Amino acid sequence: MAELLKVNNITKTFGGIVAVNNLSFEIHEGETVGFIGPNGAGKSTVVNVLSGYLNADSGQVEMNGVNITKMKPYQRAHMGLARTYQIPRPFPELTALASVATSALCGKKRVNQSFEDAMVEATHYLEFVGLFSKRAILARDLTFYELRMLELARSLATTPKLLFIDEVMAGLNPGEARNAIQLIARAKEQFGITIFWIEHVMAVLMESADRIIAINYGEKLAEGTPEEVVNNEAVIEAYLGRGWKAYA
């Protein structure tokens, strides 16, 4: 598989606190890569650096061989990078349809696209996530699960090559979580996207991820298949705990 994203020795500090320390890894086209670690491990900082919301102190990020380290978030979106947020960030005064259409205008194939065309395209993404019947409802009036799905529709509408998913299972009941897992799997297959998935629900990554990267204190603890990572002693000690049932 071709290399899609390459992270080279990135470091990020906040005052005297080292949030990310000389971290390197790669993501290849077509993969689902899980990203785990205890609270405060630096996961959110890594995602914010990779998506352009924070600047790394040192190191380099490449996408498709292009150095994107200094690019703004909108420039990275044009390169094909999209993300969801752990806490949904809707446009509260826009309808679900207008919210997705607005995001569609930010993607990598949107030069000179009209808002009317974006609205038409947005209907397809709302149908995909099961929100077509809610298209005329303001985002502020959607349920929490519906906001999660709206967030996914908005990210897909940018036609990403690489999608960062940030703890999409948080706050969902078992039925909603199952629907979300199946929907993400369908999105990967139907739209040909690569996924970098930050998640605390390990059972989800055991089912969905091709590889998992574990970090703690901003440094890589382990990297490998889900089975290899959950059986790694450093990961068990720092994150999973001794009560975790290892996979043979």
Label for each model-derived stretch:
Residues 2-248:
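Glycine-rich phosphate-binding loops of nucleotide-dependent enzymes
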